[in-house]
């Protein structure tokens, strides 16, 4: 959580995880594009997973961000928090750790030290699991 000093010089004003989203799909897309390129393309050993996100229902970063926005809103979670955590966990959707792109696991759920963790049937279900 982000903290800001209040008038009493204490830190009680925090950015909540739950609540109304303070961003838009377009802002999430701009943020992604400022940090990464080649959506749904992978390098090295993960190159064989090129197109996995499209197969899972999100062929563009716009579609991916829209899914994040919709799933977060449905659960009362701020989409910008979900999106930021997803980008952190997946290296801006490039992966490279224990989780593979075709698992649609955007939060590293169940992944611990060489264990791939949970797999989900598509992007939306994976995002929903992350949000919940």
Language-model features, listed with the residues they occupy:
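Catalytic cores of secreted/periplasmic lytic hydrolases that degrade extracellular macromolecules
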Residues: 2-132
């Amino acid at each position: 959580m982000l903290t800001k000093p209040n008038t009493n010089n204490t830190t009680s004003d925090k950015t909540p995880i739950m609540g109304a989203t303070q961003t838009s799909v377009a802002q999430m897309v701009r943020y992604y594009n400022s940090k990464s390129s080649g959506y749904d393309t992978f390098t090295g050993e993960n190159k064989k997973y090129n197109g996995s996100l499209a197969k899972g229902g999100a062929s563009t970063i716009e579609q991916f961000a829209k899914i994040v926005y919709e799933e977060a809103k449905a659960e009362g979670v701020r989409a910008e928090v979900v999106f930021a955590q997803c980008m952190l966990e997946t290296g801006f959707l490039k992966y490279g750790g224990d989780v593979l792109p075709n698992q649609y696991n955007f939060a590293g759920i169940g992944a611990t030290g060489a264990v791939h963790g949970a797999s989900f049937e598509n992007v939306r279900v994976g995002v929903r699991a992350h949000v919940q």
